[in-house]
Design a protein with these regions (language model features):
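Non-catalytic terminal extensions of ATP-dependent helicases
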Residues: 1-170
């Protein structure tokens, strides 16, 4: 009987150590998430989505209404006047960059100059966003972030927006 009691006491003690360790892990995770939250707020502040008092600004309200794509990038492009001089067909093609997620094995360069220029601007803005995120101590790989905007459907969407059928495009 004393042996069983000792084993039971050891089990209870180990159980309490497990609970303590889990609590320490949860506390550490909370601190890590809090640090990440602070970094993300820093990014939002730098781009003017929130002010110093962390009050949501117009840019952030617009970003909240964007339901697909990279909200930060699209809001920045919108407020920087990126879409102002584009035709509706170009806008449709450009927006495909933000929703197309497939990786293409064959990547040829864009043949249309009127699409290549906006794509370069998107990639340039993506580099700026990635650099600000890195400066704000977020773990963002600049090249991976830029490559996450897949342009492979741009020409197809452009032709479709100009009235061609998918049968004619493919």
């Amino acid at each position: 009987m004393p042996e069983l009691y000792e084993q039971y006491s050891a089990k209870v003690e180990l159980g309490s150590k497990v609970k303590e360790t889990k609590k320490k892990i949860n506390d550490a995770m909370s601190i890590m998430q809090l640090d990440e939250l602070k970094c993300r707020k820093r990014v939002l502040r730098r781009f003017g989505f929130i002010n110093e008092a962390e009050v949501v600004q117009l840019k952030a309200r617009v970003a909240c209404e964007i339901s697909s794509g990279d909200e930060l990038m699209l809001s920045e492009l919108l407020f920087n006047g990126f879409f102002n001089n584009l035709t509706p067909e170009q806008i449709a093609a450009v927006l495909s960059v933000f929703v197309f997620e497939e990786k293409s094995k064959e990547t040829n360069a864009l043949s249309r100059e009127d699409l290549a220029k906006p794509l370069k601007e998107i990639q340039s803005q993506a580099r700026i966003v990635a650099k600000v995120a890195q400066e704000s101590k977020l773990a963002v790989n600049e090249d991976e972030y830029v490559k996450s905007f897949h342009w492979e459907l741009m020409e197809v969407i452009y032709e479709w927006a100009n009235g061609k059928s998918f049968f004619d495009i493919w």
